[in-house]
């Protein structure tokens, strides 16, 4: 059975609806980034799906199309804030910030995952990046935005290979931490126990 990726958008036809997804919950370094997208249902961009199912080249192409045609915004929470409030709270904060940063205020906000929000406009959808075009578009914006941020940080700290691993705990990244120690961008709450 084919999944209708516009199912949730069709469910709320008379509301301004935004989709939100995040990138960067699991890495050892860098921020968590959430993106919010309001899709124009009269202008559906072909090929939008969960960013994890797309090649880097395709993600970049879709990023350009989404940002040119849809209302979108990001919310970025730093590694230091993640260490202060924990990754779950930081992710929620990034999602709320992304919604607040939209130039048009959404009446319904679909969020990928199972996080609980006090704001009743926020509806969490498990596997949402496969079930909602708005969330899938947001997953692309979040992923590309975060990858670009990590590329910038990699220019400053090339030894950690963030341009390749985006801050995730790959074997090479772990080896670099052992060899060079932690950078100012590492999440201490993620790395302290591993790399004293």
Swiss-Prot record:
GO terms for biological process: DNA replication, removal of RNA primer; mismatch repair. Its EC number is 3.1.26.4. GO terms for cellular component: cytoplasm; ribonuclease H2 complex. The keyword Cell inner membrane does not apply. PROSITE patterns: RNASE_H_2 (PS51975). A divalent metal cation binds at residues 21-22, 112. It is found in: Cytoplasm. Its cofactor is Mn(2+); Mg(2+). InterPro entries: RNase_HII, RNase_HII/HIII, RNase_HII/HIII_dom, RNaseH-like_sf, RNaseH_sf. It catalyses: Endonucleolytic cleavage to 5'-phosphomonoester. Residues 15-196 form the RNase H type-2 domain. It comes from the Bacteria. HAMAP family: RNase_HII_B. Belongs to the RNase HII family. Endonuclease that specifically degrades the RNA of RNA-DNA hybrids. This is Ribonuclease HII.
């Amino acid at each position: 059975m084919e999944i209708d990726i516009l199912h949730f958008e069709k469910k709320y036809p008379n509301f301004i609806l935004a989709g939100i997804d995040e990138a960067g919950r699991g890495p050892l370094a860098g921020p968590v980034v959430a993106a919010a997208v309001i899709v124009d249902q009269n202008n559906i961009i072909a090929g939008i799906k969960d960013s994890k199912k797309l090649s880097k080249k395709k993600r970049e192409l879709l990023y350009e199309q989404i940002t040119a045609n849809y209302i979108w915004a990001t919310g970025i929470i730093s590694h230091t804030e993640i260490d202060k409030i924990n990754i779950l709270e930081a992710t929620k904060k990034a999602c709320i910030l992304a919604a607040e940063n939209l130039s048009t205020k959404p009446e319904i906000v679909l969020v990928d995952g199972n996080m609980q929000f006090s704001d009743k406009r926020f509806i969490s959808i498990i596997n949402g990046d496969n079930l909602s075009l708005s969330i899938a578009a947001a997953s692309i914006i979040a992923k590309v935005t975060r990858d670009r941020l990590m590329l910038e940080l990699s220019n400053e700290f090339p030894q950690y290979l963030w341009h390749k691993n985006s801050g995730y705990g790959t074997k090479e990244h772990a080896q670099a931490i052992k060899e060079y120690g932690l950078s100012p961008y590492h999440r201490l709450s993620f790395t302290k126990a591993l790399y004293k």
